[in-house]
Each structure stands twice: as C-alpha cells, then as structure tokens.
C-alpha cells in the first residue's frame, strides 16, 4: 500500500511568485501586525494530502485477468458439454436447466473479463466498457437469482414437473438481471485507458441504484435464504430453502457487495474515515473483493461439477436401468 496519487509540481512561474511573496512578507515583517486565521483541523480526508492505496489490479494484473478468462471459458464449456451431450440422462439432475444457465452465465462473465482488464491501453472505448460492465454484472445478477430460485423451488424446476415454469423463470430472471445492469451501464466508461465506473455528482443517482442492487442481490439474498432456512427449521414448518454446495457461489460475491456499499457511503460522505489508514484499507478491500468476484468464473463450473457428482451418486441407485441394460444384466446373471 502507499500513496499513489501524486501532487502536481509547481511551475517556474508559480515558484518565482511564491518566492517574491515570501521576500515581501519578510521585508515588511517589522511594520505589519499579523492576524492568524482560525484553522479548521477537522477538514475532511479529501482536503488533505492524497490518502489512497495503490491499485492492486493495475497493468501488472493483466496476466491474472487473461488466465482467469481462459480457464473460466474452458471450465464452463466443459460443463455445458456434459449437460448437453446426447447420452446425458436428464433425470439425474432434475434442475439441469438451472445448472446450464449458471454455466452460461459463468462463460459470459469469462468472455468479458479481458474487455475490462487493465493494461490494454487505447483499445478501451466508452461503448465497449459500458457493454463489458453490462455483461459483467448482468451475468452475476442472473446467476445469483438462479441460485435463489433453485434453492426455493428445488426439484420442481425439473423438466415436466411444472409446465412452463422453467421457461418463465428463465425469461424473468435474465430480464430482471438486464434491468439491474442499466445503472452501471450508464455510469461507466473509459478513463485514462481504463474501464471504470464514473463517479460524479450528475451520476450519483445511478451509482446509488447500482449499489443498492448489489447489496440486495449479493448480500441480502443469501442472508434471506439462510434466515428462511433457520426460521422454518426452528418453527418446524418444513425443510425450507434447499441448501447445497451451489450456495458456495455467494462466497465470491458477498464481499464485493459489502465493500461496494461501504465505498459508496464514504464517497457520499455519509461515512467519514478519520485516518488515512482506514481509506487505504478500504481501497485494498475493494481490490481484493473484485479479484475474488472475478475468480468465481473459474470456481462456478467446479461447483457445478461437484453438485452434479453428488446428485448422480444419490439418484443413480434409485433410477431404473434402460431396457437393454437390464436384459444384458439378466443374461449375465443366468450364466453365472
């Protein structure tokens, strides 16, 4: 960490002017009575020397972005191939449409990671950056909402369970996710060759809306699922939301939602940081939370594969074998 914002150097004209002013004040020091103005020692942090931590996700982090993108695309493609291969038995995973959409969301995120990566210089444009943030957060919002529906509806999402339910949820979830990305899409662009959200007074309403959306989807949604699970279990009202390994997805986005909310409070001066160390710590947490969120595109396919393995191990013994397999096993049994 350190101070990465450098103060502007004085121009020669400014230095000469300052020197003349100092000499005039020195020569007249015996004839003038000075009155010292009151000094406001409680000025806010931004009025003091720059007090921000170095950005961890700068140009040097470009290999991290590229490697994560490649691994995420390969892993998501593998999961999609498994789910859509011709011999796949759909009854092994009643909620396979949700799993497929989670893999698609992870793949979309992986594709746009290089677009928002630093170090690409002049290749960034405002339109491309806005599109990147739209897909970046849209895929994440959709995945979170899909996980919430999967936990709440469980096996009712299987094919043939409730006609039209899966299609309706798919259209609704991705539509809501697209609407939630409008604020960050409109409040982002290219600045200094980097894709970044634009913080300005004119866009404060959009920034607030985006922050609220992140808090609701990444923070409050998993907390609500956990709360409903515990409440139903305590009151004996049934099992509650279906808890499984897929909930591990929120580990990668929950910190991002929390730190983004804190950063908005600080920028809005609703939360004042009293020391430089606190501001530097917040900057560091922002970078770490963003890096953790980026890693979800690699972890999500692995989580899906583990969930599929658990589902097949649980349901396979109870499923009837195909007709050809059963006759073949009967033949082997008679020979023995």
Swiss-Prot record:
It is a multi-pass membrane protein. Gene3D superfamilies: Rhodopsin 7-helix transmembrane proteins. Residues 1-63, 117-129, 188-207, 266-287 are extracellular. It comes from the Eukaryota. Belongs to the G-protein coupled receptor 1 family. Atypical chemokine receptor subfamily. CDD domains: 7tmA_ACKR1_DARC. InterPro entries: Duffy_chemokine_rcpt. One of its GO terms (cellular component) is membrane. Keywords: Disulfide bond, Endosome, G-protein coupled receptor, Glycoprotein, Membrane, Receptor, Transducer, Transmembrane, Transmembrane helix. One of its GO terms (biological process) is chemokine-mediated signaling pathway. This is Atypical chemokine receptor 1.
């Amino acid at each position: 960490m350190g101070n990465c914002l450098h103060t502007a150097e004085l121009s020669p004209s400014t230095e000469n002017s300052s020197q003349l002013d100092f000499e005039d004040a020195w020569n007249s020091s015996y004839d003038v009575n000075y009155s010292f103005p009151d000094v406001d020692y409680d000025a806010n942090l931004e009025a003091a020397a720059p007090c921000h931590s170095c950005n961890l996700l700068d140009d040097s982090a470009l290999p991290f972005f590229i490697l994560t993108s490649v691994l995420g695309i390969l892993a998501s493609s593998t999961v999609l191939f498994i789910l859509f291969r011709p011999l796949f038995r759909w009854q092994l995973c009643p909620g396979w449409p949700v799993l497929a959409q989670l893999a698609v969301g992870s793949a979309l995120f992986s594709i746009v990671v290089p677009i928002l990566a630093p170090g690409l210089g002049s290749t960034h444009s405002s339109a491309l950056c806005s599109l990147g943030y739209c897909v970046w957060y849209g895929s994440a919002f959709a995945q979170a909402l899909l996980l919430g529906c999967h936990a709440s509806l469980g096996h009712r999402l299987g094919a043939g369970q409730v006609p039209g339910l899966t299609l309706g949820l798919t259209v609704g979830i991705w539509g809501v996710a697209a609407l939630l990305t409008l604020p960050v899409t409109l409040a982002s662009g290219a600045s200094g060759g980097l894709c970044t959200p634009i913080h300005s007074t004119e866009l404060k309403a959009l920034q607030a809306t985006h922050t609220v959306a992140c808090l609701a989807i990444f923070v409050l949604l998993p907390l609500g699922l956990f709360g409903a699970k515990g409440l139903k279990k305590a009151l004996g009202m049934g099992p509650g939301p279906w808890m499984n390994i897929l909930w591990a997805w929120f580990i990668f986005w929950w910190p991002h939602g929390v730190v983004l909310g804190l950063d908005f409070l600080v920028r809005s001066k609703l939360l004042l940081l009293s020391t430089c160390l606190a501001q530097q710590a917040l900057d560091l947490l922002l970078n770490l939370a963003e890096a953790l969120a980026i890693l979800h595109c690699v972890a999500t396919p692995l989580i899906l594969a583990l969930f599929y393995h658990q589902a097949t191990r649980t349901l396979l013994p109870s499923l009837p074998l195909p007709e050809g397999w059963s006759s073949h096993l009967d033949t082997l049994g008679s020979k023995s």
